[in-house]
């Protein structure tokens, strides 16, 4: 009797638009279409990394409930329009951009001054309209993040440095706009009880639909890999090693450098300054210990905790016989 589960062999990508596609995979054993389709959909909607405007400073504006002479939109509408600009950063996690324009006319995302490693996917997106004599001068902070972050939850390492007039935005980092999936019937030779999974996805253009599905699958693999380490009812990663300080007794994720956590540059540099090079080093530190690190404040701590939680880890964990022998402490 055949006991091996079928694995999908045929993958078809159908482009429905510039940022809209269907990805079909088959064949799956009966039931696996819904099992994997629902998991991929939830990850695509909640856990994709992207870029968004998080803070704005507008010349002559102290708060968002203001209006600007010569600008048709009030500040609230300008901020709403700004949230529709799609940014893509290369080789950096945050950047502050400038937008300066005066005179009658339309202000679009194309008017934002960007360095060579910052891309605006929708340059024709309208931000504001200026009347005769109108002027708009603003600084826009763009950051890398995951999912959705309300502005009232953002914390600053030092409130004293918070400048007057800085407006914090609710940030939707996810590059995925819509996701749905359907399960159809598939056939292999004489078997007709198989599933075909069709995932329909629309993005904002910062990532292709195929890359988004690929990234979501990678996240699922990383999460499920922890279950493969189960041994004796506990995670093998935290069991005492069977050999003399051997790497085999630790979960592979703990041996990865902290750079793979994709933290902001500020957070990553603070950790390296404290000789925290590996994820295994990091999870053994407590919140209080990290807060004593120079230049690492509550905002960075929350970021670290969220990234670790997405991988099933927390601060303050105990690892016996860490570090393993031969681990490079660069």
From Swiss-Prot:
Q: Where is this region: Alpha C-terminal domain (alpha-CTD)?
A: 250-330
Per the record, what about its domains? The N-terminal domain is essential for RNAP assembly and basal transcription, whereas the C-terminal domain is involved in interaction with transcriptional regulators and with upstream promoter elements.
Query: What are the recorded Gene Ontology BP terms?
Result: DNA-templated transcription
Q: What Enzyme Commission number(s) apply to this enzyme? A: 2.7.7.6
**Keyword set, alphabetical order:** DNA-directed RNA polymerase, Nucleotidyltransferase, Transcription, Transferase
- The top EC class, named as a word, is transferase
Could you say which protein family the record assigns here? Belongs to the RNA polymerase alpha chain family.
Its quaternary structure? Homodimer. The RNAP catalytic core consists of 2 alpha, 1 beta, 1 beta' and 1 omega subunit. When a sigma factor is associated with the core the holoenzyme is formed, which can initiate transcription.
> Residue ranges of region Alpha N-terminal domain (alpha-NTD)?
1-231
Name this protein carries in UniProt: DNA-directed RNA polymerase subunit alpha
The cellular component terms of Gene Ontology attached to this UniProt record, alphabetical and capped at eight, are:
cytoplasm; DNA-directed RNA polymerase complex
